[in-house]
């Protein structure tokens, strides 16, 4: 033990990294398909390791780690958050606000009734509402109150205890509530409602201007006989299904396939579009030919395009196609991805900022259409460190600004400032794609390492006090956590279904998004046997990340007694 104590006093960072490593490995273990999650496991492991001795970490380390995490959260959510400030998505925003507001009211009610200290109340909110970032924002707010060191450490220990006890409970309850309890509360069968929604989304005739096809794309070569003397436009309209003539070869020379170009007998042409339409085009054009060289010369491509045009936010694919019009000629939509999950495709599927469209067609055509949609996702592995560092620095500076609430001087704190900076930087990146690059892999690394390191530092430094608090108030925290998790979910469900008249399938996805529990979306999709719940996730997820994070300073302000 003397050696262990020597390492603790000399190099405590070794145990911090060990806690992150062990907690991450345990968090990935699945039992009957269920995993606790890395954040909770890191905290539990660090609290247990904290029983070995007294760990001391510089405040700067925790500030930097948490700032990296919360800035990245803001960066990822920024485009969706600002785009959600729209009439078209007002219902989903309102639902997320109601859920977060209800959670805040219940936490404060418990705090006043049971005289909970700010740390315990903040930990309860962080765990029961499954939002780890509340730990950081609450800790930052407490640090600004000028508390004695021992008092501040006890408050941080209480945050850790409240979170450790209630997070797993809140996570499990959300996983069970969204796919099972919510549909029963609304009086619907989720599977049947999903089928109805799919029919509704796929209903109606395709619009004339809908050039974004959600069918399989194929290109074939024909030699013109029957189509001689007709224009490209006439042939494309005759074949239908948004088929496009991509190439014309006349006597060995390429002819630009403009809409008014007249085809001649003997021309070799390449048409692209739905497989069924192309196969049926033979009597309209002529004989299909084996022309590998002609087909190889077509610069076909499959590119992902990030939707960042706010004018398209909340609109249907049909509406998006109408707005893009002729610029989408020859471009086909193969997939729509939202938060890493593929959304069901139909003419009425809604598109949101932050979605990724997988487009198929010639490179030229895709690049033309992409200008109207957003930005092509280029493969790259470099992060704009200058942009990242400057953004976090600006956020930390903004966090120093103070204002008074009830005679208490409060600030956004480093966490709140970094969150706002991340939101603005993420939005700015969507407006100016040439600056502020942060590839998804880098975002995930910064987020995981920042939060994991911060949580480990909290658990190690306050391990003994947190363990004492858990032993003293564990059952009480469990009871409060159950209420803080379930009541906001129930209120939000009833509000969305009966007041906002939201589709029950969309409501289930929105509940998971507002609680920022991705796994609950997967559960809803499995019960519904459909991907339609994914359609409700995007906006509440972005709003929920922001709303729940700022609860930390609010709870501290309302419960602190000087």
From Swiss-Prot:
Record key words, sorted: Cell membrane, Membrane, Repeat, Transmembrane, Transmembrane helix, Transport
SUPFAM superfamilies assigned to the protein according to its UniProt record, in alphabetical order: TrkA C-terminal domain-like
A GO cellular component annotation in the UniProt record: plasma membrane
Keyword hit for Nuclease: no
InterPro entries the UniProt entry points to: AAE_transporter, RCK_C, RCK_C_sf, YidE_YbjL
Bilayer topology annotation: Multi-pass membrane protein
Primary location class: membrane
Single GO term (MF): monoatomic cation transmembrane transporter activity
GO biological process: potassium ion transport
TM stretches of this protein: 4-26, 33-55, 59-78, 90-112, 159-181, 385-402, 406-428, 449-471, 476-498, 505-524, 539-561
Pfam families recorded: Asp-Al_Ex
Cellular location(s): Cell membrane
Name of this protein: Uncharacterized transporter bll3471
């Amino acid at each position: 033990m003397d050696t262990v104590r020597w390492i603790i006093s000399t190099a405590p960072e070794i145990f911090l990294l060990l806690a992150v490593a062990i907690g991450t490995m345990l968090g990935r273990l699945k039992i009957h398909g269920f995993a606790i999650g890395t954040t909770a496991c890191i905290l539990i492991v660090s609290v247990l390791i904290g029983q070995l001795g007294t760990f001391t970490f510089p405040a700067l380390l925790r500030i930097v780690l948490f700032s990296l995490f919360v800035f990245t959260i803001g960066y990822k959510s920024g485009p969706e958050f600002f785009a959600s400030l729209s009439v078209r998505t007002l219902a989903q925003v309102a639902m997320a606000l109601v859920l977060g507001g209800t959670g805040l009211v219940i936490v404060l009610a418990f705090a006043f009734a049971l005289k909970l200290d700010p740390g315990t109340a903040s930990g309860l909110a962080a765990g029961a509402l499954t939002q780890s970032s509340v730990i950081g924002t609450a800790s930052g707010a407490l640090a600004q109150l000028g508390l004695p060191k021992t008092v501040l450490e006890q408050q941080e220990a209480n945050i850790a205890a409240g979170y450790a006890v209630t997070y797993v409970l809140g996570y499990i309850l959300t996983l069970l509530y969204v796919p099972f309890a919510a549909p029963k509360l609304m009086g619907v069968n989720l599977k049947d409602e999903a089928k109805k929604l799919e029919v509704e989304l796929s209903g109606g005739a395709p619009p004339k201007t809908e050039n974004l096809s959600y069918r399989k794309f194929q290109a074939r070569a024909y030699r013109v006989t029957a189509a001689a003397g007709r224009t490209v436009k006439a042939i494309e309209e005759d074949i239908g299904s948004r088929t496009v003539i991509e190439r014309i070869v006349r006597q060995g020379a390429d002819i630009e396939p403009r809409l008014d170009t007249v085809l001649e007998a003997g021309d070799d042409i390449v048409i692209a579009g739905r497989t069924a339409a192309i196969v049926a085009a033979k009597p309209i054009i002529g004989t299909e030919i084996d022309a590998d060289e002609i087909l190889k010369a077509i610069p076909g491509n499959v590119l992902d395009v990030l939707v960042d045009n706010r004018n398209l936010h909340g609109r249907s694919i049909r509406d998006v196609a109408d707005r893009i019009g002729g610029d989408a000629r020859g471009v086909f939509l193969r997939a729509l991805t939202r938060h890493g999950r593929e959304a069901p495709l139909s003419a009425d599927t809604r598109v949101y900022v932050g979605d990724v469209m997988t487009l198929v067609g010639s490179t030229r055509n895709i690049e033309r259409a992409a200008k109207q949609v957003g930005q092509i996702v280029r493969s790259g592995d470099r992060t704009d460190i200058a942009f990242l560092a400057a953004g976090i620095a600006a956020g930390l500076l903004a966090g120093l600004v103070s204002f008074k609430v009830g005679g208490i001087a409060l600030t956004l704190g480093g966490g709140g400032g970094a969150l706002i900076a991340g939101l603005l930087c993420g939005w700015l990146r969507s407006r100016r794609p040439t600056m502020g690059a942060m590839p998804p892999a880098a975002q995930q690394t910064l987020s995981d390492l920042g939060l994991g390191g911060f949580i480990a530092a909290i658990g190690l430094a306050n391990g003994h006090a947190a363990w004492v608090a858990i032993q003293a108030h564990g059952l009480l925290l469990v009871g409060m956590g159950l209420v803080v998790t379930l009541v906001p979910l129930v209120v939000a469900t009833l509000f969305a279904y009966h007041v906002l008249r939201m589709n029950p399938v969309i409501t289930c996805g929105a509940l998971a998004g507002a609680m920022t529990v991705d796994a609950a979306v997967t559960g809803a999709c499995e019960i519904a046997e459909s991907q339609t719940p994914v359609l409700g996730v995007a906006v509440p997820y972005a709003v929920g990340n922001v709303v729940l994070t700022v609860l930390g300073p609010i709870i501290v302000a309302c419960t602190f007694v000087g």
